[in-house]
Amino acid sequence: MASLGLQLVGYILGLLGLLGTLVAMLLPSWKTSSYVGASIVTAVGFSKGLWMECATHSTGITQCDIYSTLLGLPADIQAAQAMMVTSSAISSLACIISVVGMRCTVFCQESRAKDRVAVAGGVFFILGGLLGFIPVAWNLHGILRDFYSPLVPDSMKFEIGEALYLGIISSLFSLIAGIILCFSCSSQRNRSNYYDAYQAQPLATRSSPRPGQPPKVKSEFNSYSLTGYV
């Protein structure tokens, strides 16, 4: 039952990680305008994502424009797009595989490969979490580097957007989910091997008597003397 509970917790975390990765990938707020120095008094604030950028006016109106070209974007944005899409695809595949391998499902109940399928789902969750964490950490490092650089003008500095925080949390959820699924299946396999060895132990002790030792008669197992009652 412990492994079943761990699998459920791992799958829920993996599903939350997938949903969070999808939302973080689509949000246009990977980095937002920084109001420091001469840029404190500005009429327009900008926020940029992987697929679009938005401008928020002082009147409260927000306008978002999708990038007209993808090949003309910076290399870090293109790499982040590819990694986030790949991470979402791998995490989706991990959700499907984990459903087949979990003990609470009806798929392949009599098959011994059920635990291996669950472990494969956990490995895919770990891979998806890593692919989602790399672009988030990469953009986070670039934002902090430009923010504290004296060579970058204040109007070109950005702050960390909420999409990056969501991406970090989602990737950690996917990593933890994969580790939990792999650990639950490995512990269940070790426990089953122990039970098999324990059940086979009495059969091994019921062996034939040693050479030179006469077999015991049934009366020898009785601790009471039969002649005492005559």
UniProtKB/Swiss-Prot annotation:
Q: Which UniProt keywords apply?
A: Cell junction, Cell membrane, Disease variant, Disulfide bond, Isopeptide bond, Membrane, Phosphoprotein, Tight junction, Transmembrane, Transmembrane helix, Ubl conjugation
Note the Pfam families from the entry. Answer: PMP22_Claudin
- Biased composition, class Polar residues, residue ranges: 220-230
Q: Where is this site: Paracellular cation selectivity?
A: 65
Show the cross-link location (Glycyl lysine isopeptide (Lys-Gly) (interchain with G-Cter in SUMO)): 218
Parts of the chain on the Cytoplasmic side = 1-7, 103-116, 184-230
Q: Where in the cell is it found?
A: Cell junction, Tight junction; Cell membrane
Catalyses which reaction(s): Na(+)(in) = Na(+)(out); K(+)(in) = K(+)(out); Rb(+)(in) = Rb(+)(out); Li(+)(in) = Li(+)(out)
Q: Output the superkingdom of the source species.
A: Eukaryota
Q: Which Gene3D superfamilies did the record assign? A: 1.20.140.150
- Annotated region described as Interactions with TJP1, TJP2 and TJP3, given as residue ranges: 229-230
Gene Ontology cellular component annotations, sorted alphabetically: bicellular tight junction; cell junction; cell-cell junction; intracellular membrane-bounded organelle; nucleoplasm; plasma membrane; tight junction
What is the membrane topology noted in the UniProt record heading this document?
Answer: Multi-pass membrane protein
Record PTM Phosphoserine, positions in chain: 219, 223
Q: Where is this region: Disordered?
A: 205-230
Task: Please give the Gene Ontology molecular function terms for this protein.
Answer: identical protein binding; paracellular tight junction channel activity; structural molecule activity
* UniProt effect for mutating residue 161 to R: In OAZON; uncertain significance
**Which segments sit on the Extracellular face?**
29-81, 138-162
- Which residues form each disulfide bond in the chain? 54-64
One GO biological process this protein is involved in is: calcium-independent cell-cell adhesion via plasma membrane cell-adhesion molecules
Cite the record's note on assembly.
Can form homo- and heteropolymers with other claudins to mediate paracellular barrier and channel functions of tight junctions in response to physiological stimuli. Homopolymers interact with CLDN3, but not CLDN1, homopolymers. Directly interacts with TJP1/ZO-1, TJP2/ZO-2 and TJP3/ZO-3.
Task: Give the family this protein belongs to, as stated in its UniProt record.
Answer: Belongs to the claudin family.
What's the disease link here?
Azoospermia, obstructive, with nephrolithiasis: An X-linked recessive, male infertility disorder characterized by epidydimal obstruction, hypercalciuria and kidney stones.
Question: What PANTHER family does UniProt report for this protein, alphabetically?
Answer: CLAUDIN
Q: What is this protein called?
A: Claudin-2
Q: Which organism is it from?
A: Homo sapiens (Human)
Q: What is the lineage of its organism?
A: Eukaryota, Metazoa, Chordata, Craniata, Vertebrata
Q: Give the gene symbol.
A: CLDN2
